[in-house]
Amino acid sequence: MSLIKKPGGKTIEVVKNLPRITLANLRPNPGAKTLEKRRGRGMHGGNRSGWGHKGERQRCNRPRLGFEGGQTPFYLVIPKYGYNANHSRQPQYPPLSLRRLQYLIDLGRIDPSQPIDLTQLVNGRGVEIQPQKRDYGVQLVDEGADIFCAKVNLEVQAASEKAIAAVERNGGVITTSYYDPRSLQILIKPVPFFMPGEPIPKRLFPGEDLLPYYTDANNRGYLADPDKIQTARMDLAKKYGYSIPDISKDTLFEMLVQRKNPRHIFFGLSPGWVVNMADKKILKPTDDKVLQYYGS
């Protein structure tokens, strides 16, 4: 009669007989710590006391890492290409995946029956935006495009082509929009801005480097021609092999067609208005000069 061998039986027996780990037998692995070379001080320890001959090394004033004695260091000589030119001033866009967006909708943190912008995404703890670290919004990436099934009116700052196709395939609408740093701070934290009773400022237009992106219909830019956007939607549907649903008869049609004015920060709130949090009222300006300033 043969004995039945249990998988891992010998290993379990060895572990049972090993001593238990306690504070008394904890020690570094062999070779993890090396003893520092003992060097003499003053007249002791040999001719040069283990510090070599004169100079910076003997006097414990070693040069910084990468210093080559005054000549142009290697990392400045080769290569001389502008791969990282102005890297400290380039805008950052933290990624937001379609999988994460669907997860937030399924949990009820984000209401798909209302337009979704950065205010909803931040309040739903979906993304973290830090303008002081040059964050200019979120970038929608196509991770989870095969499981995304929500019909949304979404506003982001950048989006990949496949992510745009995944949103429009379900009958949704996506817009890429730019916010200057002050407008971005107001958008992600509206309540602290409303508390002092300041008027809502105008949103600024993007600079020369970002203007081509937000005027391109293929990127669904908020400054692009609406007719060109409709043509780009049809071309993208042909490319990925799906048909665009007719939203004109949809119950959420009014929500899906909502758009922000390029100068507006919030949905339904115009520049120059003051939100009174204490009385829960909205104060609108009546002076012609003020209206002309905020309307321009």
Curated annotation (Swiss-Prot):
GO biological process, alphabetically ordered: translation
Source taxon at top rank: Eukaryota
Renumbered residue ranges of the record's region Disordered: 25-59
Residue runs in coiled coils: none
Transit peptide interval: 1-20
Gene Ontology cellular-component terms listed: mitochondrial large ribosomal subunit
Subcellular location per the Swiss-Prot or TrEMBL entry: Mitochondrion
Entry's transmembrane regions: none
GO molecular function: structural constituent of ribosome
Chief location of this protein within or outside the cell: mitochondrion
InterPro entries linked to this entry: Ribosomal_uL15, Ribosomal_uL15/eL18, Ribosomal_uL15/eL18_sf, Ribosomal_uL15_bac-type
Alphabetized UniProt keyword annotations: Mitochondrion, Ribonucleoprotein, Ribosomal protein, Transit peptide
Assembly description: Component of the mitochondrial ribosome large subunit (39S) which comprises a 16S rRNA and about 50 distinct proteins.
Similarity field: Belongs to the universal ribosomal protein uL15 family.
Designated name of the protein: Large ribosomal subunit protein uL15m
Organism: Danio rerio (Zebrafish)
Gene that this polypeptide is encoded by: mrpl15
